[in-house]
């Protein structure tokens, strides 16, 4: 069971992160931004392959992911005056590769001492060839050229391929696409569940009965149409639930229409405690379901909206103090919930995945620096001001945001450990 839970956790969390980052990747590529890496997880690489311009990687720690876009790189490679570099050329006599070190491994490279280098706008390098130190040469650099550092290729990004070069509305779309993709994923999962298992209906009928439940023991069957309970007409499934809850361990006269006949069956609901410790009745029947494309589409939409509202309500309670910080869950808590839900069946596991996907989308839209919501806030401010925020100031605010998130992660992880193991 432990192995099954680990696999389920990795698949669910990995899928949510994959689609989130896929949203960023697709919109960034559509805007013409060079995406250097698409990563699932953080830390050391476990697996990687390159397709077109992007390296796709799976990393050791399954706690998130990222899309590394040109212009946002923390390790920018610079070619400054006085540097000695090697140049390799394509068939059009444009520089195809700029060799930063280990030039001895490339005997065909033209070695120059750099005088000037503009690898963002003009795409030119000037310098002095060895043996021609009195003659300044100029070289055009291809827009699809590479640096070679320690034997590895790093694509050079002209300014028009960098994140910051794009209109603010394109950058907003690239950042917002991640959380939006999580909402789309949740909606698709819920629609699929609606198509496969049916959509809950409010008709006054019985759905699937639980084994050894009071309804099954009394002789009720799935599909029975409940006309009345104790003489009171039942107009909906909601009416049935209310009547059953009000009669714990009390015999009820249930009028049932079955095969065009009316039957009277006595049922005594089991007494159970609800979430508020109040005693209510339960007789072991699920809500009826109906199948159809339109009903599944509507179910996906309404369920996505309902879950979103519930999460936002809890977030507002967290701000007002009605919802305590120690009630939040981190990766450890989510793992435990995955374990509990996995035991109840694959359908509930998919519903849980949809809930987590919406949760991930909402959390990432919070205006906290280092999250997508924080980046969107900076971009909206830029759109209003007409110019970007100072990069150093933005970097400082993002650093504070990262520190806050790390602290929050430690707190919720400690809460999970205390709640589950101590």
Curated annotation (Swiss-Prot):
- Please indicate if the UniProt record lists NAD as a keyword: no
Active-site annotation: 21
Q: Provide the membrane topology annotation.
A: Multi-pass membrane protein
Where along the chain is Zn(2+) bound? 20, 24
The UniProt similarity line reads:
Belongs to the peptidase M50B family.
Q: Membrane spanning segments where?
A: 6-26, 175-195, 346-366, 394-414
Q: Species name for this entry?
A: Bacillus subtilis (strain 168)
Q: What is this protein called?
A: Regulator of sigma-W protease RasP
UniProt keywords (A-Z) are: Cell membrane, Hydrolase, Membrane, Metal-binding, Metalloprotease, Protease, Transmembrane, Transmembrane helix, Zinc
Q: Where is it predominantly found?
A: membrane
So what does this one do?
Is responsible for site-2 cleavage of the RsiW anti-sigma factor. This results, after a third proteolytic step catalyzed by the ClpXP protease, in the release of SigW and the transcription activation of the genes under the control of the sigma-W factor. Can also cleave liberated signal peptides of PenP and Mpr, probably within in the cell membrane.
Additional record remark: Regulated intramembrane proteolysis (RIP) occurs when an extracytoplasmic signal triggers a concerted proteolytic cascade to transmit information and elicit cellular responses. A membrane-spanning regulatory substrate protein is first cut extracytoplasmically (site-1 protease, S1P), then within the membrane itself (site-2 protease, S2P, this enzyme), while cytoplasmic proteases finish degrading the regulatory protein, liberating the effector protein.
A cellular-component GO term for this protein: plasma membrane
Q: Where in the cell is it found?
A: Cell membrane
EC main group: hydrolase
